[in-house]
Amino acid sequence: MKKLTALLLAFCMVLALAACGGGGGSTPAPATPTAPAAPAAPAAATPAAPSGGESKGLTDAERAKEFITVGTGPTSGIYYPIGGAFATALQEYGYSTSAEATNATGQNIQNILNGDCEIAIAMQDAVMQAYTATGAYEGKDPASDLCALMRLWPNYVQLVTTANTGITKVEDLRGKRVGVGAANSGVEINARMILAAYGITYDDIQPDYLAYGEAIDNMKNGQCDAVFVTSGLPNATVMELGVQYDMVVVPIDGAGRDKLVSEYPYYAKSVIPANTYNNTEDVEGVFVYNIMLVRKDLSDAMVYDMLEGIFANISTIKASHNAADKNIDITFGVDDIQLPLHPGAQAFWADNGYIH
């Protein structure tokens, strides 16, 4: 796969976009995530040259020798086209690149740690659990080789069901068959944490460890009662469900939500706006940011150079998906990141005036 040509990569991106319309040093002090920002002015997307006028990145000759594999996600999801656009942007800057389809967050974290990817998309809650060896990663060695490159877009945790189940709140999931995501995936980590905030464990439900697309198919066949989905908005699979069935988007609200965001600062309160799906009113919920991971052992110069390339070709990335267009921008690319930045990223963001 690492031998993909630029033409094949572009072709794969087109297919993916057609399939979807819509997860170092010491840990910094927790910060409350901000709401997703509005798009910045286009002029802000051009990185400034560091003081002295010379880039701290690579030369053209050095860049041409490097190969970057970008860890994305399933071809049916949002990670794939956006990750593919990152690969294209870096290719336009002079790198050889490949966008690798994966099972998303969980596999991307492992691929970074194994050295199978240079950069990869992942949800920050799972990343921080891996980094601190807590939650789903309890008992494992802390993943101290993970570093952050930049913040990406918010993933909204969505709980969907159909009207005939009678499920209208999280507490109604007790005794029900629930699609919680593939085992140890970003979605499954979200599901487990949210259920716990409401005092529910997997012993109280019948968990189905399936990717949300498969779980929604089971729900259509009456073999599943509710499904957790974590993605940008809107999600094409959820939209299709809402067209074909009397779908209900279950709110994640009240004391359970308060407990969740209090205990885990990478979650923030949000709403799924009215008419995102078949919901006629806003639905209370939570989101968690995706971040771009980078291998700790990459040189500072290469990481700095990758960021220069990303923002030199940011229009390529913004064109890949609505979530990227609204949320990936240099003006807020370092906000709300709790994982330590790679030193090369630290230098880039400092030189451009976004950290001090």
Task: Please provide the spans of the model-predicted regions.
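Ligand-binding clefts/hinges and TM-proximal coupling segments of bilobed small-molecule sensing domains
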Residues: K176-M193, Y264-I337
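N-terminal (or domain-start) structured segment
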Residues: P47-M123, Q129
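Short, low-complexity disordered leader/linker segments with a strong preference
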Residues: M1-F67
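An extracytoplasmic/periplasmic, membrane-proximal ligand-sensing/linker region
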Residues: A64-I68, I82, L210, E214, ...
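Acidic, polar ligand-binding/catalytic clefts
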Residues: C117-W153, N235
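Pocket-lining segment of extracytoplasmic ligand-binding domains
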Residues: Q124-A126, T134-Y137, T165, T201-L293, ...
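Bilobed "Venus flytrap"/periplasmic-binding protein-like clamshell domains
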Residues: K65-Y93, T97, N155-N221, T331, ...
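Extracytoplasmic
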Residues: K65, G94, A104-Q107, N114, ...
